[in-house]
C-alpha cells in the first residue's frame, strides 16, 4: 500500500485506470493526501459548502514564511529562491504543484456540479528582495527572488469559480512588491461564496 503527498488526491478516470488495474492485480492501494493540496484545498471547502444552497466561488490559500522550510537545496535549486525573476519563472514548481492542485480543482468542481472548462489558468508571480534577507540557504540578495505566489484557477465559461493559491515569502520585510501575510499572519484560508452567503 502507498500513501503519498505528491498528488493522486483525485485522479481523473483516464489517469486512474492503469493504477487501479495495478492495485487490483497486486492487492494494494494508492492514497493521495496532504494539507494543500490534499486537505485544506478540497475537503474543507466541500464540508463548508454544505452551509449554502448555491456555491459561486471557492478559494483555498496558503500564506507561509518559507524561511522555516528546512531544505535549503530545494529552496535554492528547485524552488529557485535567490535566483533572478527571469530564472525563477522557469521553475518546475508551477507544473509540479499544478498536478496536485488541478486534481483538487477537479474534485471541487465535480462535487459541486460545476461544468469546468478544460483549461486551468496557472499563474506564477515573484517579489524580489530590496535588501539582503537572511534565509536557510544563506542571504537572499537584492534584486533576486524572495517571495513567490502560485495560483491555479478553474473556470466555467471563462469565469473563475475555484482558486487555489500558495504565497511563499522569505519574511515580510524588504520585498518589492511589498507582499505580506496580513494581520492574520501565516495561515491557510478557505473561502466559499454562495447564496445564501
List the predicted regions and their residue ranges.
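General beta-strand structural signal in soluble alpha/beta enzymes
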Residues: 2-5, 30-33, 59-60
Amino acid at each position: 500500500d502507498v500513501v503519498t503527498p505528491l498528488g493522486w488526491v483525485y485522479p481523473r478516470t483516464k489517469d486512474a485506470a492503469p493504477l487501479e488495474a495495478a492495485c487490483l492485480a497486486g492487492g494494494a492501494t494508492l492514497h493521495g493526501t496532504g494539507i494543500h493540496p490534499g486537505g485544506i484545498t478540497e475537503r474543507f471547502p466541500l464540508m463548508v459548502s454544505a452551509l449554502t444552497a448555491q456555491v459561486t466561488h471557492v478559494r483555498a490559500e496558503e500564506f507561509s514564511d518559507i524561511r522555516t522550510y528546512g531544505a535549503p537545496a530545494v529552496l535554492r535549486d528547485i524552488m529557485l529562491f535567490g535566483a533572478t525573476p527571469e530564472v525563477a519563472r522557469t521553475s518546475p514548481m508551477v507544473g509540479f504543484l499544478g498536478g496536485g492542485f488541478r486534481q483538487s480543482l477537479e474534485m471541487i468542481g465535480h462535487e459541486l456540479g460545476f461544468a469546468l472548462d478544460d483549461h486551468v489558468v496557472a499563474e506564477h508571480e515573484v517579489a524580489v528582495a530590496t535588501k539582503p534577507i537572511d534565509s536557510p540557504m544563506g542571504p537572499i540578495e537584492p534584486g533576486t527572488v524572495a517571495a513567490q505566489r502560485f495560483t491555479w484557477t478553474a473556470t466555467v465559461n471563462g469565469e473563475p469559480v475555484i482558486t487555489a493559491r500558495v504565497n511563499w515569502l522569505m519574511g515580510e520585510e524588504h520585498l518589492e512588491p511589498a507582499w505580506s501575510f496580513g494581520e492574520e499572519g501565516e495561515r491557510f484560508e478557505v473561502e466559499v461564496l454562495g447564496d445564501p452567503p
